[in-house]
Amino acid sequence: VADLGGLSPALTVVVVVYRPRLEEFSACLKSLLAARADGLDLHLSLWHNDLGVQQTPGLADLYEQLQAAGLPLQSQGGRGNLGFGGGINTLMPSLRTPYTLVLNQDAIPEPRSLVLLAQAAAADADDVAAWEMRQVPYEHPKDYDPVTGQTEWCSGAAVLLRTAALQAVGGFEPRIFMYCEDVDLSWRLRCAGWRLRYLPRCAVVHHTYSEPGEVKPLALLGSVYANLCLRTRYAGRRQVLQGLGMALREMLAPQSFAGRRWGIAKGIARFLRNYAYFRATRQAAPGFEPRFAGWDYEVRREGAFHAFRPQAEKQAPAPLVSILVRTHHRPGFLRQALVSIAQQTHRPLEVVVVEDGSSDGEAVCGEFAARLDVRYFRLDPAQGRSRAGNRALAEARGEWLGFLDDDDLLYADHVEVLLQAAGAANVPGAYGLAWCARTRVVAEAQGQVEESFRSVEPDEPFNRLRLWHHNLMPIQAVLFHRSLYEQQGGFAEDMDQLEDWNLWTRFTVNAEFLQVRKLTSLYRVPADFAEAARRQAVLDAAYDEAVRRQERIKFTADPLRVRHLACDFARQNALIHLDRQQLFSMVGEWPWLARLNLWRSVVWRRGR
């Protein structure tokens, strides 16, 4: 039995059932039984939006088996389809446990995820009302704070709610039958003063899409109606008019599925019938700002359809990964960096912290002794960034290595994403996309900043010629195999700027790297124009020396590699580039060009 450290709150799992696939639903419910075996006190409450157990052959037997195995289970419903939120609202008055886990019938919690979820909720602050679980294989792409885990809204597919908070705001909105009712609930909780968290280390297997980029007609049509309702409740008339304009443009666009225009028109008509209701139930609160991004409600991280593997499909044993942190007299930033590492979904993991000169970081590292395998080293006197990095490399034990300077952050899936991608492509290095966050430092020692703007940069696929010209890979965005360090060595210790660029050029002389189009990290640059200009001037001054050092790099190449480099060079330096292969492909796509090319060949042969 797992030791929950005395933090084992009773919770009720509520599932709205509608014509389930028995095998999938059985796996979902059996995972709850496994959580009870791990020591978690949970109860299951089911609401049938279909006809009940007689609707699905074998379901009654499954319920009996689970009850006999010790799972407290109560099944109700059979009154017709009340919608997802409507079904949960019907169960809400009977909820007596401190926490309620809302779970889709096809969402299967990963082993021990519910135990971790319960521990996190019990240990959290009293003003947190919701803890969202990560969905596998496709994580929802909405952004979240990689330090606090706070998010703007929680998906209803798998979310633990504080029961008192759920009941206080009245549960789900009854006039939103399906889609975006979870956004509305999240925003009402926030307006009532509650905070929401995302817990990526607690996961469910939830196959929401049959293929990447799938268009789901019901979701699209339901979202149009719900979006207009939310604009009415949480924003002004200008946002409502903007939403109606978007809906009309959607009607004029080419149909991606049959009945699309008619479905949107019905959604608009339904919204107009409910406009007065949502206007009368407007919500607002100090500090709450609704976000409408088209039909979405969040800033999104690139990489929505990066496919994660469930635990059962992962490599075993997983390799040890070392995250190497350089720091200097910034304990607040270091603490944030270590929190973002502790949130990593990959295990096993170690952290090597090297402090250059100062000693503030030792106490910070001590705070994480129970959460991380963290080792602290100090250089005294200060010896510079490159020597600090080399000390970290020398101390690392991991098979794979990555850097995280103290003012940068990792999203929780960073190591998992890059390790999986590098393994699938059989390359010794991979790098993800990163936010470039323009910030003003309010209190450096405490790590307090004000962020003004974010962008994804750089965003370039791996290309040696481009890498020889400029750095494609922010230092925290890269994960590499330790064999590269063993072959090429570490940082040039006489470099204090662009030392990472020099390292990447040496690592990739004979090794391929892979760009992974998923955003997994964040680095900060000055928002102040004068400060940014001073920083850029320092980098510019170091650039020529960094380029000169490339003259010392030697590599061998076969004819095929030379040809690829030549093609890359031509493509990189051309304003308009069309190579022979592209021309042949274009000719093949246009029948009249193909016929013209055939006649040209015939005439040419006869002319000879």
Describe the role of every protein-language-model region.
Residues A107-Y144, D413-V449:
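Conserved donor NDP-sugar-binding/catalytic core segment of glycosyltransferases
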Residues K30-D41, V339-P348:
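Short, acidic, metal-binding catalytic loop of nucleotide-sugar glycosyltransferases
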Residues L46-L59, E355-V364, P381, D405:
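A conserved acidic beta->alpha catalytic loop
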Residues G222, Q239-K314, Q536-A542, R563-R608:
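Non-catalytic, C-terminal membrane-associated alpha-helical segments of glycosyltransferases
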Residues T100, L401:
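Short aromatic/hydrophobic "clamp" motif used to bind/position activated sugar donors
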Residues M178-D184, A219, D496-L503:
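Acidic donor-binding loop at a coil-to-helix junction in glycosyltransferase catalytic cores
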Residues V204, E214-Q242, R261-A280, L519, ...:
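Catalytic core of nucleotide-sugar-dependent glycosyltransferases
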Residues G77-L95, L379-A396:
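Glycine-rich, basic loop-to-helix element that forms the pyrophosphate-binding segment
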